[in-house]
Amino acid sequence: MKGRSFRMMLLALATVFMVAGCGGDNSDKVSNPDGAVAFAIHEQSDGILGKLLNDVKAKSEGAGWQFVNEIAGGNANLQLDQVNKMVDDKAAAIVVIAQNGDSIVPAVKRANEAGIPVIATNRDINGGVFTNVINNERQAGELQADYMAAHLPQNAKVVYIKGDMTISAAVNRYEGFKEAIKAKRPDVEIIASNSTGDWSEAQGIRELSLWLGMYPQIDGVAAANDNMAIGAIKAMKAAGRFNDSVIVCGVDSIDDALASIAAGELKMTVKQDADKIVETIMGLLQQIKQGQSPEKGDVLVPMIAITKDNLSQYK
């Protein structure tokens, strides 16, 4: 009797493992390569994110692939529903610019279970399995440090204006700058940085207005984006503390930043290479359309330093 009970227990355990094996993660499979390329973007954008959507759409349709996209309008719950529908519609692949890195996770996991590859870009997703095509944000800070290291005077004093430090891009830009400037120019001192920022020009004005009252010497300003860098320049001008020897560096290569470089005020910015991001995403989609599951994890896209010396290539 004991032997029969033991055999029944083994059979029950085997059944449990077989059932478990029937579901679960199919993220290494491509269940429907003939389906549509689906693109979920967090909000309408005329900048780099809008370019990503428009270029992937144009190239996908140019390749003869069906293409669908959804715009969440800043609503994380709506985006969750949109991506879930893409899973239900059996898309070939889903490209996501997430409104919220936590809220979107259940839909990413559903896509994994359905064998639909997920490609994330620009914004973090905090769970599930996906390929993450992102700028090398750490390199952005390193490029700023490279420029400052080459142009700052001995024993220079600099300040750093952080972006939203809940976002990994802001953290990596700051860490890249801090470590690179220390390694390249140990004589340079970062005398101040804010705890977090909102990426706005007003933030740059506020921080520099405060620091100008505290520090008689500020030789350089590195900012996590161009808007804050331009705000810093405005604050320094208003205080009568801006001149050609002050080095201000930004990130994003927005039109106002390029104009400021042309005017000799902003010394450099860092360009997110949208064309390279699109090229990388299209390469992954080509794999998927051929039935091949792409490599998971981060795919880092290099950034580009823009100064007066190469400005004409990017205006």
For each feature predicted by the language model, list its residue ranges.
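A residue-level marker of the well-folded mature domains of exported/periplasmic proteins
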Residues: 2-5, 22-315
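Sec-dependent N-terminal signal peptides
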Residues: 6-14
